[in-house]
C-alpha cells in the first residue's frame, strides 16, 4: 500500500514538474534590447524602469486582426492609465521596415510607439508566433507574467459585437493584486503569422 501511495505521489510530482517546465517555456523573459520605434526614438528595457509593468503588443503592417484589435488595446491603456503601466508595440515582420510601419501608424491612427524588432530578437526570445498577442512584463525582473489575446472579440473570419472575456484586463488585475495568472484559462491568440528566420 505504501509503495502504491509513493507511486501516485511520484507520478503527481512528475506531472506537476512537467507542467511547470511547459509554463516556464511559454512565459519566457524579455531580453535586454536597444531598438528604434517608428518615430525615431530608441527603446531599451531601461526605458521602462520607472514603470511597474510594460505591456507589449505584437503589431504587423497590413494584418487585419492587428488593426481591428487596436481600439481594444487602446481601451485597456486608457483604463489603466493611473496604474504605472507602459503600453507599447513591436513589429517583428522581416518585410515591415520603419517607413512602412510609420505609414501604417499614420493611416490607422496608431498612437503607441511601434518598435521595429530588428533581427527578430524579441520574437525569438519570447517565442512570438502571431500578431495581436500581448506580453505583460515585470520591468524589474524582465519576467513575462502574461501572454495571450486582449479579449475574445476577434477570431478567424469572426468578430463579436462586444467582448465577453477581457483576458488582458483580468491578467493585469491579478498581477496588480499580487497574484499569478493562470495561463490554463487563457486561449491562444488569433492573429497573422509572424515568420521567424
Where are these regions (language model features)?
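Bacterial N-terminal signal peptides
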Residues: 10-17
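Thiol/selenol-based redox catalytic cores and closely related redox-interacting motifs
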Residues: 119-197
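Sec-dependent signal peptide recognition
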Residues: 2-10
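Structural microenvironment flanking redox-active thiols in thiol-disulfide oxidoreductases
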Residues: 67-108, 115-125
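Structural micro-motif
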Residues: 31, 109-113, 128-135
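Short active-site neighborhood of thiol/selenol oxidoreductases, capturing the structured segment around
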Residues: 46-67, 172
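Short, thiol/selenol-centered motifs that function as redox-active sites or metal-ligating centers
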Residues: 60-70, 190-195
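N-terminal "domain-start" segment that seeds a small globular fold
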Residues: 21-46, 58
Amino acid at each position: 500500500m505504501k509503495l502504491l501511495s509513493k507511486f501516485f505521489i511520484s507520478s503527481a510530482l512528475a506531472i506537476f514538474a512537467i507542467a511547470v517546465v511547459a509554463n516556464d517555456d511559454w512565459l519566457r523573459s524579455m531580453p535586454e534590447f536597444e531598438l528604434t520605434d517608428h518615430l525615431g526614438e530608441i527603446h531599451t528595457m531601461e526605458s521602462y524602469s520607472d514603470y511597474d509593468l510594460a505591456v507589449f503588443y505584437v503589431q504587423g503592417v497590413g494584418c487585419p486582426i492587428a488593426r481591428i484589435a487596436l481600439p481594444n488595446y487602446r481601451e485597456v491603456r486608457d483604463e489603466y492609465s493611473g496604474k504605472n503601466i507602459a503600453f507599447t508595440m513591436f513589429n517583428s515582420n522581416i518585410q515591415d521596415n520603419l517607413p512602412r510601419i510609420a505609414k501604417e501608424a499614420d493611416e490607422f491612427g496608431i498612437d503607441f510607439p511601434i518598435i521595429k524588432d530588428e533581427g527578430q530578437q524579441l520574437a525569438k526570445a519570447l517565442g512570438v508566433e502571431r500578431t495581436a498577442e500581448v506580453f505583460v512584463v515585470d520591468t524589474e525582473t524582465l519576467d513575462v507574467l502574461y501572454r495571450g489575446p486582449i479579449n475574445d472579440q476577434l477570431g478567424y473570419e469572426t468578430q463579436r459585437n462586444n467582448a465577453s472575456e477581457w483576458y488582458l484586463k483580468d491578467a493585469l488585475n491579478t498581477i496588480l493584486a499580487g497574484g499569478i495568472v493562470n495561463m490554463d484559462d487563457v486561449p491562444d491568440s488569433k492573429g497573422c503569422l509572424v515568420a521567424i528566420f
